[in-house]
Each structure stands twice: as structure tokens, then as C-alpha cells.
Amino acid sequence: MAAVTAAAVSTSAAAAVTKASPSPAHCFLPCPPRTRAAHQRGLLLRAQVSTTDAAAVAAAPAKKEKISKKHDEGVVTNKYRPKEPYVGKCLLNTKITADDAPGETWHMVFSTEGEIPYREGQSIGVIADGVDKNGKPHKLRLYSIASSALGDFGDSKTVSLCVKRLVYTNDQGEIVKGVCSNFLCDLKPGSDVKITGPVGKEMLMPKDPNANIIMLATGTGIAPFRSFLWKMFFEKYDDYKFNGLAWLFLGVPTSSSLLYKEEFDKMKAKAPENFRVDYAVSREQTNAQGEKMYIQTRMAEYKEELWELLKKDNTYVYMCGLKGMEKGIDDIMVSLAAKDGIDWADYKKQLKKGEQWNVEVY
């Protein structure tokens, strides 16, 4: 499973942060300096686009260099390890898919008492109770964090997960249950849970409050993006006010499998100019050609707009979910890049170096 966390918040920082009012104060951070990768990518773009496009790129305003999110000294990793995990309590565990959905997904909240300082985009590990068939403790499983650094209760003392119960039939016709996912989905409030981490820097949010952030998720891959979006639209900070574009694409099999839709509806109503969301419901929707509506199919409807955004130094793409989504998205980008005479594989490498293409699939 993919992994993700939220920010370590010091006592003074926590005091400076409150839940958002209907009209939060506008606070802007300076735009960060340009990385070498961004510079190289600019050269690549200039060398390969048509004369018209090259002129447009050359005329674009100069960007300041970006500060790498991975070099932030405040990001904590591996505070708790498997041999000495943190033991939290389950405070809440709720099924968030409808009864007729193909599979169960649960949203759960654990107490941390502020001892697991995480950031949006990180993950935690969970060790299920009991032992394996060899009599040894179960190995940890990583899960993307689904809450902002403040947590669902806004006090920086909880962490939330979004977990799908794994149940399948093997080649021998036996029903197999995933050890950790079933342990988590069966947790009752008050139960202990062993937690490790936080871990990961790949999926950390960009610091630029004016960034364009494109989020591509399938199923429980929505977890890190819920953490992003809560920070952007449900919370108020003295030093951060999101004023860019957050564009979410979420792919699920059925409408009864849509996760956190009510929350996203509220965000859309609150910030219609800053938040867009498009769903791809593969078993219920088709495109104009009658093809099933997968996430890449939905993205294809906006491909020119997405490509124009990808040419900008302040656009960041995050992908989380099933590994199969990656190829379909690459196929779209290959054809779009080719129209501008750009090799997508090379261009994607430059995006990755500039921390503008971030992938966590499983």
C-alpha cells in the first residue's frame, strides 16, 4: 500500500493554526527559486517545440528557483520503528463505501498525542496484532496518511487512514483475507494499534501557495490528496493560504465506491476558482466512443488543458493508487508531447528532477 504523512507541527506552529472560517485571511508565501532541473527542462522545451511555441516559452516571465521539499529540515522520518512502535488508540472507524460497493473501504482515526509529527504526503506503518504462520510478529504495512498535519480534529494529536479491506479468492478456490487491512477495518474504538514512521518525502506538498497541483487517484490512493485538500480548503494558517489550482481526478469502479465526495463538494462550493474535481466511474460511465471511463479516459477529455499546465514551472503532478493507471496516463502524455515535437520520456525525467512528477503506486 502507498504511504503518506502530514507536517510536524511545533507547539508554536500549532498555536498559529486554526480551523478555517468561511472567509479565511489571505496570506501569501514568496515564490521559491528555480532548480537546475527546471532550467534544463526549460531548455529541452525550447529546443523541441515549434517556432510559435518557442517564442511563447521565451516570452514567459522568469521563475525564481524552487526550494526542494525533500530538504526541509522540519520533515521527520522514522521516529518510530518496528522494534519500538508507537502504540496509539483507535478513536473512530467508519465504513465510507455503500453496502452495494464492490469491497469495503474504512476511514479510521488514531490518537498520537502529537508524538508522530507527520506532513501531508507522508505515510505510517501499522503492525497487526498476533503472529504469522511461523510464530513471528506480523510485518508492518505502509498506508498513506489521509489527514492533514493538524489531523481530523484540528489539534495535531491524531492521524487518519483510508483502508480497503482485502478479501480475494486464490487459485485453489480459498478465500484469503489481507492480514493488516482486515485487522484495521475490524478495529473498535479504544483498541490499541502499533504505529511506525512517519516515512516518505516523495509525495510531500509543494510549498508554493500559488502552485497548480494535479492529483490523480484510484480508490484508496485518494488518501494523500485528502490530506492536501484539507490543508488547502478546510484549515486556516497564518503563513499559508492556497491561491493556486487544485485539480483532482478520482477513478473508482462504481458511484457507491466514491470516497469523501461530500467533503469535496464542500470544497468546490467554498473555492470554485481554486478546486476542480472530475470522477471516472469505470462500470457506469463511458466516453463518446463508448469506452469505459477510466481515470486516463477522463483526463483525455481535458488533455490540451492539462498539457498547457504541464509546461509551467509551478505545476505539480501527483499520482497515487493502482499501478495500472500509470501506463494509461503515459499514453496520453506521449501523444500530447509529440504534437509539440517533445519526447515524453525525456520530458518526464526533467519533471521528476524538478519534483513536478510524483508517483506512488502499488
Swiss-Prot record:
FAD binds at R141, L142, Y143, S144, C162, V163, K164, Y168, V179, C180, S181, T220. GO terms for molecular function: ferredoxin-NADP+ reductase activity. Its cofactor is FAD. Belongs to the ferredoxin--NADP reductase type 1 family. Pathway: Energy metabolism; photosynthesis. Residues 1-36 form a transit peptide. The keyword Transcription does not apply. Coiled coil: none annotated. Its main location: plastid. It is a peripheral membrane protein. It catalyses: 2 reduced [2Fe-2S]-[ferredoxin] + NADP(+) + H(+) = 2 oxidized [2Fe-2S]-[ferredoxin] + NADPH. One of its GO terms (cellular component) is chloroplast thylakoid membrane protein complex. Plays a key role in regulating the relative amounts of cyclic and non-cyclic electron flow to meet the demands of the plant for ATP and reducing power. PANTHER family: PTHR43314. The modification Phosphoserine is found at S181. The keyword Flavoprotein applies. SUPFAM superfamilies: Ferredoxin reductase-like, C-terminal NADP-linked domain, Riboflavin synthase domain-like. Residues 83-205 form the FAD-binding FR-type domain. It is found in: Plastid, Chloroplast stroma; Plastid, Chloroplast thylakoid membrane. Pfam families: NAD_binding_1 (PF00175). This is Ferredoxin--NADP reductase, leaf isozyme 1, chloroplastic. May form interchain disulfide bonds with LIR1.
